[in-house]
């Protein structure tokens, strides 16, 4: 067997700093504790890379005894001086140290390899190959390679510094992680790994100790000591390499290492994060390998069904049966659960609390009391993690319909998760609530509109205390309150309002490459990009609005975009041209622009097998049903929620939601409202 890796990480023991070697501090302000320096604008995000050495033998370790590495290190080529700090980790060939550039105080993780450790040609080749592969990589979720140099004693590789060490350290402190945390970390691992595979590079040693966490709790894939170029099947190396517990059956059977082998290791990583131990851990290596070859492991009942299914698919014995990285992100495990936009550093040692309070939430509790007071015994709910009765399956099978979601959710500093539980939906019930109660519900609906949406004069003002989650929450509460309390009726009410509002007339899903594009009824074209940013081309085709976060808008001419936005503006124009040339409008609503209302931009979208859901910054909510081209649009105007229904003949009718609450509506419309609510709850969750 060749090269079975084991890396041992040292606790970051306190070491005496550079002052001893220099007689003074490393930087201008030596008395202060020096935090990691923020990166320059042009550089990738700064983070840690206590990257272990190129390779370590499994059966024996060489001693690291040898000449003490100097505290001050000089690059012979450039003359730059560095100060060596504490040990971050060690392995068979090298140790990894914190190292500071004395010219600018920038901190690196430096892998220092004594020439004596790589004296044999094949050992030196491994180091050279690692440098060659790693130095060309540039990705947010891959440890950044900065520089390497040699002196008479050592080889020095300078890498991105990650102050919060590795996932192995976090799991050691935490024992197990919550599902939202696992989704948070896995999304980033998949992002980095997808980039590597697109560069035709296999990592071949994915494990918790090789996922590094920076100051901002961002994950970076590191340690390319065993990485290799992807070869055609017939030319693949038959080397057995990697961490014993994470080796795949095909690697153990010497059939070669492909992308599927990295997916297998990812399955082991997910299992370990959730349960605190690897899936194939046994008392001896021989038994471990037998279990791996047979893909035999236990799946505790404590795991929820989506997590079990995703792990089982990644740990399929046959490599061809494993999901692709895109399949993984579209799996129910990600679609049906909350994923935080960021994690607090306290998550390194403490279980996070995702039940955060916010001004919007406190308001909802008061405003929605009338919607939910004393109703729970009268309404039935469906728990989508449990069995659903047969008569409801056709309407409420959304959980199984969901094949594809939008992109990762748009960053939001205030995003909260109200309830970590499966989404629920309402089933129609008989009985008519008292008139006073309906009036109370109508008042509550108006109160929520007035309190959150009706008084806004700009999108930034609308969302100052609000978030993507609370926009969805508001619409869901209002729609659910209406559905729970309106009477049964055979037809749509007579009311027909003449109103003006924006809605989506055309859309294009190009999320496999760029993002989701749409055209509004005023001919504004918008794209929600795969990175969560949003860009709009106004009807004049000359002005671009760019939203990096909720409520934060940059405006610039389409013909003179800032350099960093040029490629996105090109994509935006492509979407605009495509929809103009190839798609027809989806209904008969007049195109009216109200300059007093904030500009619409898309917050979220979701596709199931039956429908497309879109949620906008001002609370406008649209669901398009594929099979009959019917549409539901909910928006707020003048402290009132309005619902527009576009039927199969593309004829639209608009009602006040309070009218539907009092009069009821046809089963045709009610079923669509319930399905729309189910999609919204699914996305909220």
Curated annotation (Swiss-Prot):
Location comes to: Cytoplasm, Cytoskeleton, Microtubule organizing center, Centrosome, Centriole; Cell projection, Dendrite
Phosphothreonine: residues carrying this PTM: 239
Concerning PTM, the database record says: Catalytic activity is enhanced by phosphorylation of Thr-239.
Q: Where is the POLO box domain?
A: 503-581, 601-685
Q: One short Pfam family name for this protein? A: POLO_box
- GO biological-process terms attached to the record: G1/S transition of mitotic cell cycle; long-term synaptic depression; long-term synaptic potentiation; memory; mitotic spindle organization; negative regulation of angiogenesis; negative regulation of apoptotic process; negative regulation of apoptotic process in bone marrow cell
Q: Where is the composition biased (Low complexity)?
A: 43-55
EC number(s) in its UniProt entry? 2.7.11.21
Q: Which PROSITE patterns would you find in this protein's record? A: POLO_BOX, PROTEIN_KINASE_ATP, PROTEIN_KINASE_DOM, PROTEIN_KINASE_ST
Which reaction equation describes what this protein catalyses?
L-seryl-[protein] + ATP = O-phospho-L-seryl-[protein] + ADP + H(+); L-threonyl-[protein] + ATP = O-phospho-L-threonyl-[protein] + ADP + H(+)
Q: What is stated as this protein's family in its record?
A: Belongs to the protein kinase superfamily. Ser/Thr protein kinase family. CDC5/Polo subfamily.
The text the record gives for the protein's domains is:
The POLO box domains act as phosphopeptide-binding module that recognizes and binds serine-[phosphothreonine/phosphoserine]-(proline/X) motifs. PLK2 recognizes and binds docking proteins that are already phosphorylated on these motifs, and then phosphorylates them.
Name the chain's protein: Serine/threonine-protein kinase PLK2
């Amino acid at each position: 067997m060749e090269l079975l890796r084991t890396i041992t990480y040292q606790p970051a023991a306190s070491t005496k700093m550079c002052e001893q070697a220099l007689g003074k501090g490393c930087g201008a302000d030596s008395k202060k504790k020096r935090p990691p320096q923020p990166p320059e604008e042009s550089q990738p995000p700064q983070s840690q890379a206590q990257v272990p050495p190129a390779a370590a033998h499994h059966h024996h370790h060489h001693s690291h005894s040898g000449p003490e590495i100097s505290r001050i290190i000089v690059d012979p080529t450039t003359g730059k001086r560095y100060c060596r700090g504490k040990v971050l980790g060690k392995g068979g060939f090298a140790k990894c140290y914190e190292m500071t550039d004395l010219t600018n105080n920038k901190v690196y993780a430096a892998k220092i390899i004594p020439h004596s450790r790589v004296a044999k040609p094949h050992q030196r080749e491994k180091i050279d190959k690692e440098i060659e592969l790693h130095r060309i990589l540039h990705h947010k979720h891959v440890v950044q390679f900065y520089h390497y140099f040699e002196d008479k004693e050592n080889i020095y590789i300078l890498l991105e510094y990650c102050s919060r060490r590795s996932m192995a350290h976090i799991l050691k402190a935490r024992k197990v992680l919550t599902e939202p945390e696992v989704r948070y970390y896995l999304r980033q691992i998949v992002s980095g790994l997808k980039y590597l595979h697109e560069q035709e590079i296999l990592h071949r040693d994915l494990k918790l100790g090789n996922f590094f966490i920076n100051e901002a709790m961002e994950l970076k894939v590191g340690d390319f000591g065993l990485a290799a170029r992807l070869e055609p099947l017939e030319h693949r190396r038959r080397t057995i390499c990697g961490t014993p517990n994470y080796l795949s059956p095909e690697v153990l059977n010497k059939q070669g290492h492909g992308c599927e082998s990295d997916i297998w290791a990812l399955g082991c990583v997910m299992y370990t994060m959730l349960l605190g131990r690897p899936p194939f851990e046994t008392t001896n290596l021989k038994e471990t390998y037998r279990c791996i070859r047979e893909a035999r492991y236990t799946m505790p009942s404590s795991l929820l069904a989506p997590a079990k299914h995703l792990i089982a698919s990644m740990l399929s014995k046959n490599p061809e049966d494993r999901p692709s990285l895109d399949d993984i992100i579209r799996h129910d495990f990600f679609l049906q659960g909350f994923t935080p936009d960021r994690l607090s550093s306290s998550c390194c040692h403490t279980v996070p609390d995702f039940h955060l309070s916010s001004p919007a939430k406190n308001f909802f509790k008061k405003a929605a009391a009338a919607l939910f007071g004393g109703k729970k015994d009268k309404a039935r709910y469906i728990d989508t993690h449990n069995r659903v009765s047969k008569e409801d399956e056709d309407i409420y099978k959304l959980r199984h319909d969901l094949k594809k979601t939008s992109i990762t959710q748009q960053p939001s500093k205030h995003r909260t998760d109200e309830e970590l539980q499966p989404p629920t939906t309402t089933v129609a019930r008989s009985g008519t609530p008292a008139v006073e109660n309906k009036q109370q519900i109508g008042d509550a609906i108006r109160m929520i509109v007035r309190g959150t949406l009706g008084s806004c004069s700009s999108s930034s003002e609308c969302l100052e205390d609000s978030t993507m989650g609370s926009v969805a929450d508001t619409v869901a509460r209002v729609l659910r309150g209406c559905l729970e309390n309106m009477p049964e009726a055979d037809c749509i009410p007579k009311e027909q309002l003449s109103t003006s509002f924006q809605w989506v007339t055309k859309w294009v899903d190009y999320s496999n490459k760029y993002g989701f594009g749409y055209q509004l009824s005023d001919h504004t074209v918008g794209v929600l990009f795969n990175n969560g940013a949003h860009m709009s081309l106004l009807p004049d085709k000359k002005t671009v609005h760019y939203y990096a976060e909720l409520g934060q808008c940059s405006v610039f001419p389409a013909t003179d975009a800032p350099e960093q936005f040029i490629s996105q503006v090109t994509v935006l124009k492509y979407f605009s041209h495509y929809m103009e040339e190839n798609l027809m409008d989806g209904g008969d609503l007049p195109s009216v622009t109200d300059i007093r209302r904030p500009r619409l931009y898309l917050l979220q979208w979701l596709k199931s097998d039956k429908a497309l859901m879109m949620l906008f910054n001002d609370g406008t909510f649209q669901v398009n049903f594929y099979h009959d081209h019917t549409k539901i649009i909910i928006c707020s105007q003048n402290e009132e929620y309005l619902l527009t229904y576009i039927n199969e003949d593309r004829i639209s009718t608009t009602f006040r939601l309070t009218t539907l609450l009092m009069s009821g509506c046809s089963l045709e419309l009610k079923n669509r409202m319930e399905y729309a609510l189910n999609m919204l709850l699914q996305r909220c969750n």
